[in-house]
Amino acid sequence: MFINPRNVSNTFLQEPLRHSSNLTEMPVEAENVKSKTEYYNAWSEWERNAPPGNGEQREMAVSRLRDCLDRQAHELELNNLGLSSLPELPPHLESLVASCNSLTELPELPQSLKSLLVDNNNLKALSDLPPLLEYLGVSNNQLEKLPELQNSSFLKIIDVDNNSLKKLPDLPPSLEFIAAGNNQLEELPELQNLPFLTAIYADNNSLKKLPDLPLSLESIVAGNNILEELPELQNLPFLTTIYADNNLLKTLPDLPPSLEALNVRDNYLTDLPELPQSLTFLDVSENIFSGLSELPPNLYYLNASSNEIRSLCDLPPSLEELNVSNNKLIELPALPPRLERLIASFNHLAEVPELPQNLKQLHVEYNPLREFPDIPESVEDLRMNSERVVDPYEFAHETTDKLEDDVFE
């Protein structure tokens, strides 16, 4: 099982923000307002000037622009039309969605705009953002820098995943969520002064350290960087999720009591701090552990594979998935009754304890097993190879029998 950390806060990214009635409206100055005819003419000219052979659906785009203007609609959707550019936009617009096109730049954006979603384009730069903007979604572009954001006093959500950013500008105090994974970031701006920030996604960058984190934080995802240490975490009262896998960590700081998910896979850890009682998900695989201390009582997922573990502590009764493959285990403790998946391949096990009746997956290949437990009927995925056999004569006969079975199947 793998938990996608973005599911913790996926409500932020499901759709652009809608009209917010509690915000002060930004009036459009009268001298800048064009007539409907002027907009129609400008859009018709933009349609006629489409590059030949590009397959752009500018006729469809103009139809939607006219409809938006006629109805004074606050939202405009121009997804998947193959557009290489956008014309001037209706002045009353509050939400623009123009994802999955070939845009290399954006026109001047309406001052009333609150939500901008233009992911999966070819944007290399952004001009200044409208003052009322709340949502900025520009993932999967070619951005090398962002405009100044500190004065965007309504901005709540920034998604700049999968770009070429080497640095982020100072962030506004209103920010609640930032996704900046898969860039080239070497550092993050100051975060401690962001009182509403709940989630940071900065995985797959080149971060060497993290700044001090705000008290409001709930999720930090910083896997696949070059972090050698983590900042203080214990005093963050709402922190539930830490993903710091694939880094250079040798130690961890004390953990907050609110923590529910901890992924520190593929580091250089030899031990863990005291684990919070609230922890339900723990991945410490591919480290240098020789053992694990007491496990939290509500843990349902434990991956401790590819370490140097010789013995395990008692397992909590809540555990549903256990992966301890590629260790130095001689025996396993009693298995919890709710366990559904047991992966203990590549160890030194001579026997396996009694198996739970709900077990669905059992991998114990590459162990010198002398005895087999009764396999529950619930098991759907079973791997037990012939290395279990100690007697070479028995091994030879079983191998021959298996080959004959394979021939006649």
Swiss-Prot record:
User: What Gene3D superfamilies has UniProt attached to this entry?
Assistant: Ribonuclease Inhibitor (3.80.10.10)
Q: Which UniProt keywords apply?
A: Calcium, Cell outer membrane, Leucine-rich repeat, Membrane, Metal-binding, Plasmid, Repeat, Secreted
Q: Which SUPFAM superfamilies match?
A: L domain-like (SSF52058)
Query: Spans of the LRR repeats?
Result: 72-91, 92-113, 114-131, 132-153, 154-173, 174-195, 196-215, 216-237, 238-257, 258-279, 280-297, 298-317, 318-339, 340-357, 358-379
Q: Which amino acids does the record list as binding Ca(2+) 1? A: N246, D266, N326
Q: Signal sequence: where?
A: none
- Provide the Gene Ontology terms for cellular component: cell outer membrane; extracellular region
List the SMART domains.
Answer: LRR_BAC (SM00364)
Q: Where does Ca(2+) 2 bind?
A: D266, N307, E308
What's a single GO MF annotation on this record?
A: metal ion binding
Q: Where in the cell is it found?
A: Cell outer membrane; Secreted
The keyword Membrane is assigned to this record: yes
Subunit details for this protein?
A: Homotetramer forming a hollow cylinder with an inner diameter of approximately 35 angstroms.
The record's PANTHER family line, in alphabetical order, gives: OLIGODENDROCYTE-MYELIN GLYCOPROTEIN, PTHR47114
Query: What is this protein for, i.e. what is its function?
Result: Effector proteins function to alter host cell physiology and promote bacterial survival in host tissues.
Q: What is this protein called?
A: Outer membrane protein YopM
The protein's organism comes out as: Yersinia pestis
